[in-house]
């Protein structure tokens, strides 16, 4: 439990988190306990801020500024200082003061995991025995790092040690759970037949119901992949051909049952179910899948008390609303003149139209999207293409559009509303509307070859 007070109000020693964010354009810093915001402070003219806290027990928090989130482990009477340059936040952030050691160790491990991502991808093509040798070697290095850290910091609390060990080793455990999904043997032998007997021995070292760690990203990401792998193994056990399980309803139904069998209650269970629901919605070709209502009904059976129930019920309703033949939902936009309009007002009922999305804040990917649109325009000259910017900088969007030959451009003024109604999880999404103003497809990736098949069938 955390109570935010002024330290001067009581004769007691305070816990302090202060910081300096050079070049920050965000006036505030928000402190979260788990997913709940508990306090907000404002940067002064010199870009300094301070949280004065009274806490009774150690807890993992995170703070947010300008869309950047960072974990911070705080113990009673800590006096932490965090530094970062807003221009390169992730690369420049560091801690000092009492309590800094564990927080800097977590930062180092997160940075190492990012750098090792390409290495893990190379390892995924190795046969199981060689793959395990590589991971075992990395595990020993990580364990040595952890033990050296504990040795030079003998006063670490048990919670701090747990965080250090998980931040160092769980990214490796997650990779072990991913491996069966991506490895393909030359003779297509099911992977569960050729894995070393001790391949999953690391699972014996894991506490699968650690409430202290349930919001810690390395721990949570491992749990997601653990559930995925259990479902993958069970679903493909008697199958002798490779299948893309992300497109299989049976795989997603297995996840529902597995989560229930392993986690009886709590936030971890609820969050894993939330992840499973979005994985189903965004990975399966749901508009072609007549069984989506079956999934929703089975999901609801296990999630009557889920803390995310209202959110997920709304998402499921939106999935149903986006089915082919329905009229698309309405949302607010502005045109290139800065005038407010609505999605319903810009539709042209006389022509098939693709609405594509891009972001002035994701320029590299947006350029690829515009190249794809140019290609589609050449292939389908009778189709209209309308771009909607979902970035956060209206001024930059307007400036960029005015300096290009892009036509039929609009800007979303409420991305949260738009993303919930259209179910946007990345900007590759497209929305295809027919000549009668009804949905043809609301779940097709703009780069998907299937999009061209859809247009060919409508234009033929």
Regions found by a protein language model. Name each.
Residues 1-16, 442, 459-460:
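Bacterial Sec-dependent N-terminal signal peptides
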Residues 7-163, 175-176:
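A non-transmembrane, solvent-exposed segment enriched in polar/low-complexity residues
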Residues 166-236:
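Extended amphipathic alpha-helical segments with heptad-repeat/coiled-coil character used for oligomerization
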Residues 209-285, 294, 311:
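Long, charge-rich alpha-helical interaction segments
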Residues 308-344, 412:
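N-terminal "domain-start" segment that seeds a small globular fold
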Residues 341-373, 384-388:
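Short active-site neighborhood of thiol/selenol oxidoreductases, capturing the structured segment around
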Residues 400-435:
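Short, internal strand/loop/helix patches
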Residues 432-460:
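Thiol-/selenol-based redox modules, centered on thioredoxin-like
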